């Protein structure tokens, strides 16, 4: 929730979510995030079928022997700032879709609820975000740090 709050605080009007693949991820979460943020959410989700595996994949027969024809059914979609579908999840097929988004709806919905407006009580709480690039590994040699 805090990472999302940081994005909301930056004034995000369009959020792009990338999922490994499956309507089970996109159907509920996309609408929830859109309604919570009062922004548009585009969820992009992968489609994986048996025939999509390269033929030189190690142990391919073993991987696919009990697999269903579709391993990840996609589910790419767009939800509006009110949580309603602009484009419902597209499953079991590849495709490209487009939509025209009315960003005035974002402002209208934020009149109803603004997640980082006065409801967030900035007089009581504060979220600090460290935007400095972080290193995954810090090497230490004789007590000093080397990044």
Language-model features: where?
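Cysteine/selenocysteine-centered motifs that mediate thiol-based redox chemistry or coordinate metal-sulfur cofactors
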Residues: 106-147
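A short, polar/charged loop-to-alpha-helix boundary motif
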Residues: 93-113
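A sequence-level detector of short, solvent-exposed, charge-rich linear segments
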Residues: 22, 26, 53, 60, ...
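CN hydrolase (nitrilase-like) catalytic-core segments centered on the catalytic cysteine
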Residues: 1-97
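Serine/threonine-rich low-complexity intrinsically disordered regions
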Residues: 49, 99, 121-123
């Amino acid at each position: 929730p805090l990472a999302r709050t940081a994005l909301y605080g930056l004034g995000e009007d369009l959020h792009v979510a990338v999922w490994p693949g499956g309507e089970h991820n996109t159907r509920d979460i996309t609408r929830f995030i859109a309604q919570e943020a009062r922004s548009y959410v585009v969820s992009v989700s992968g489609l994986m079928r048996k025939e999509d595996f390269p033929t030189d994949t190690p142990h391919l027969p073993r991987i696919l022997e009990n697999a269903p024809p579709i391993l990840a059914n996609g589910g790419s979609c767009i939800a509006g700032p009110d949580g309603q579908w602009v484009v419902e999840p597209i499953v079991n097929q590849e495709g490209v879709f487009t939509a025209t988004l009315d960003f005035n709806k974002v402002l209208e919905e934020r009149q109803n609820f603004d997640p980082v407006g006065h409801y967030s009580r900035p007089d009581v709480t504060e979220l600090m975000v460290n935007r400095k690039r972080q290193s995954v590994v810090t090497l230490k040699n004789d007590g000093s740090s080397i990044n």
